[in-house]
Amino acid sequence: MEEPFLPRDEQLVSCKSTWQSGQVTVELKKVSRLAAPMATVTIAQYLLPVISVMVAGHIGELELAGVALATSFTNVSGFSIMFGLVGALETLCGQAYGAEQYEKIGTYTYSAMASNIPICFIISILWIYIEKLLITLGQEPDISRVAGSYSLWLVPALFAHAIFLPLTRFLLAQGLVISLLYSAMTTLLFHIAVCWTLVFALGLGSNGAAIAISLSFWFYAVILSCHVRFFSSCEKTRGFVSNDFMSSIKQYFQYGVPSAGLICLEWWLFELLILCSGLLPNPKLETSVLSICLTIGTLHYVIPSGVAAAVSTRVSNKLGAGNPQVARVSVLAGLCLWLVESAFFSTLLFTCRNIIGYTFSNSKEVVDYVADISPLLCLSFILDGLTAVLNGVARGCGWQHIGALINVVAYYLVGAPVGVYLAFSREWNGKGLWCGVMVGSAVQATLLAIVTASMNWKEQAEKARKRIISTENGLV
């Protein structure tokens, strides 16, 4: 039976001793043991829709265009919201586990599911009319038809997200990441088989690719539900406290809404980037290259996001346990891992800059452009990794609202205007747009670093315990 990776600290550790190299080394090991499986889980989840897009691309150009458009639209209007909302559980479940309020972990998780499902109904209404909406916005009717049909079959997947995402945070808060790893990898293999069967063996076309996504995410939700229900590792935490249910829903939205803002504002900016690239002088080239850069950046981002999930878990656990010194060392450990991974992957990308474009295109023009913009992408790796880890700190502490406000300032008041100016007024084209993103990331990283460095960790620990133990007295 899997044991949690988060052993209890029997006593508070002095501030001086926590910063000694031995303590940092111990914390590095603990964070790494959480981060590596979570990065793999994130990759597996990310690959499900990617595989469906790849399979649809082998059907025809029309199907590829429609599926890509639907994937972009559903990510922005639905899946990003689900991913954002459950960030609240990284605060609530993690701190409840640290405070040994085990039954509240289950209550928070069930309240998240109950809150997500009505939101899914609202979003699904929008998805039903995607075809008409896209045509109204000037999209090609045939592409809009494929996108509309594909999105309709993704509605069940949206509801699956409402279930499995809270369960993922439920297990992560307890350090049960190996269960998540096995479940995610099993689901990935299941999806490959089901997608091929529905699309090619049964001839369902692009709709089959969407159905495969829905079936796979529900398969994932069922596996996680069975683990929570039947495994002894969750015996203490799967309970339900009915008296706390309504106050838990209020707390979920209190931290979930700014957490959704934290995630969605970033996701939406990159979709805006692709839209702006279509207005440049050579739209096909610019859109292709920026899409490739975005794909490379997203694939890299799963590594620091795994580190961020680990840091968020360690920070929330230790604050809930009243051990702010170790929580602070967890941040240092996360930053050390960020330095190592960003240096490695930036160097790797820069070394392979002249050939990596061939992974996505046979066009010499595209490959050369990707090589030209790769140094900027290397800098993005560094900045994105830092912001990911610091956002993990924000979720662990419960100040998602500050992170969301920083995102508005960094990306929409600074980054986006700079990118548009450089791309159109200075005629830097795609490079200018990407420079704008980098400026926004730099501002975001700077502001998050200032907030983190000036944080009173003892005060954060007191707030965490008050937040969890005094739920019945109202919101904190």
Swiss-Prot record:
Disulfide bonds: none
A Gene Ontology cellular-component term: membrane
InterPro entries documented for this protein: MATE_euk, MATE_fam
Gene Ontology BP, a term: xenobiotic detoxification by transmembrane export across the plasma membrane
Membrane association type: Multi-pass membrane protein
Membrane-spanning parts: 34-56, 73-93, 117-137, 146-166, 184-204, 208-228, 260-280, 289-309, 331-351, 370-390, 402-422, 433-453
Main localization, broad class: membrane
Protein family according to the UniProt entry: Belongs to the multi antimicrobial extrusion (MATE) (TC 2.A.66.1) family.
Listed name of the protein: Protein DETOXIFICATION 2
Organism listed in the record: Arabidopsis thaliana
